[in-house]
């Protein structure tokens, strides 16, 4: 978890001094999975955002639309695919965990397709839940249930967050897996617990990409790769993009940071497909570092959720504006006018 940020901080810039220093960058645009974005970053998928603020993913989609950047909806959203689609005004993607197994996954894919998602993002690194010790300490489990036991275990956290408590109470402490609503398997409607069970029993494999490709008419992207051999396998499978990610360090502690993995994967995959990265992105300068190392764009995870928790939709909008402004400022100080001028020659790695 810590290495995602630590490895970003090890990178230092080598600016080009001259006539371009301080001049407004003329081109911060990027084509990401075939859609134009005014800036080289997007909102990444985060589960249970409704537990942070009642606005949840709807607020995130609205904020992304204001800036014109893509938004990726998590299967673990507290709002339905259709609710988020109605709020989105920029291209949006759907991140797939096959809740309910293959049958449930097919239903979610069909709904996302009908609602207008342009890209299907299949997360490959969650074959079993990670051992998240903090969650275990305060009794968190899936699906989220707020009762006397969980409130007691979380009391020391809640008592210092009166604004959060007020918002959650007004939302009646609803943290649902909204996209399992109405899901069926073998003709029977599934409860949330059952949908989760079948996902764990039938996690996605490389072979599943075949039927997903047959059902999905848009871009097919795999997320959660940190191994160069897996990147080659993804290319062989015919994917349209790769998201380099160690799941925020929340799955397997000793995986390399996303940035370190990007160094290995980008040279292999970026000549063929768009390569994105997430993990530790907190500043616009972090986005620029990722672009210098071959990423097409970066995804925000915790950063946008911090804004959501602090101020709902307006909080997310403010975070996106901060990231955008920092990208522009960093480019000015580096002496580049276009995203296309960013490369490894502008970076050096601290030796410690």
Annotate the PLM regions.
Residues 66-70, 86-92, 115-118, 215-219, ...:
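Glycine-enriched alpha-helix->loop->beta-strand junction motifs that scaffold or abut catalytic
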Residues 1, 6-9, 257-277, 282-352:
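Alpha/beta catalytic cores of nucleotide-metabolism and tRNA/nucleoside-modifying enzymes
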Residues 1-34, 139, 143-146, 151-204, ...:
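An N-cap/entry alpha-helix motif that binds or orients negatively charged groups
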